[in-house]
């Protein structure tokens, strides 16, 4: 089994504000489905109003760092047998959230 990070950029969800309850329910339905399938590890949204903090070479600096056009808006971590399975779950998340999702394999699992 391999873990994957599925994420979207903050600001990529461009649906009308009145659609938010329906989008949230659709996203929660996918999470419930992933939990029932035993593939859900963790997920959540990133609060964009919080300043980031960066730790480098033993020191900590207030951010945000670096200047960037895209910031992660939310993510899911799943554990599935194959890349194709990860892509299938990413497609379900994309459909429910109405925005593109990026899929990345997690190379290091501290539990292994």
Predicted region positions:
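Conserved, structured core segments of small domains
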Residues: 1-112
């Amino acid at each position: 089994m391999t873990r994957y990070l599925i994420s979207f950029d903050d600001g990529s969800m461009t649906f009308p504000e009145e659609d938010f309850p329906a989008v949230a329910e659709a996203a929660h339905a996918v999470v419930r489905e992933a939990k029932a399938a035993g593939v859900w590890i963790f997920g959540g949204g990133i609060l964009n109003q919080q300043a980031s903090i960066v730790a480098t070479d033993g020191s900590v600096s207030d951010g945000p760092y670096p200047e960037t056009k895209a910031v992660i808006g939310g993510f899911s971590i799943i554990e599935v047998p194959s890349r194709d399975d990860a892509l299938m779950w990413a497609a379900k998340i994309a459909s429910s959230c109405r925005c593109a999702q990026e899929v990345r394999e997690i190379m290091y699992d501290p539990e292994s």
